[in-house]
Amino acid sequence: VSERPVYLYCDGARTELRDASALWGKDAIETEEALLAEGGPGSRVACIGPAGEKLSLIAGISNDSGRMAARSGLGAVMGSKRLKAVVLNGKRRIGVHDRAAMKRLSQKCNRWVQFQPPLFTGPMSPYVGAMMRIMPTQMAMDGLLYKFFIRKWGTVSMNQVSIEMGDSPIKNWKGSNVDFGPARSRSVNPDAFIDRERVKYHCYSCPLGCGGKCSMTGKYTETHKPEYETVLALGGLCL
């Protein structure tokens, strides 16, 4: 454990721990902005905010202005070491055995991801979930099928689907879709979030682009589009 707050800096030529005392106490966005300005063009930052510093067991690691590695309290692991951030700024090109073949495969993948037929609409969500609930056997689904939903709405695409199929924490997992039926769960339909979404964005090198920024009124003018678990943790879980 470091005696003082530090961050790890690596640019390919050197790897070193640098003092982060001035950053300790800052939130993740403030920290990332400060380290990007210091690291220069091409830098990437993963960092924690006050929750991670205080070893909160729900603290995540933030990157790309608020995208979170949020499972299992990873932010608390960094905080326990007094590691405020990791900053990478590599310049070395990554070698590929067959660059032309890699390019073709990447382009093929991108075309598939960006192909978005109008197969599914927001109001269909509860019916799809109910259909999955009453099926006598569950079928394994190709993960690529989910890209239609994730690309359009993000993870909130599964809100009403998961409620109706029984895969949502209603009443802290003691309840069911009977307690939070379509009439009530309409407030978490994915279209409710798209109505506020003003711009989409991608995490670094991701062709899917499930992220979005939503407009708000009040003290703050915008926020990240919420994720499925956040919405339902503050919804059906609290019943």
Question: Where is each model-derived feature located?
Answer:
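Intrinsically disordered, low-complexity segments enriched in small residues
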Residues: 1-239
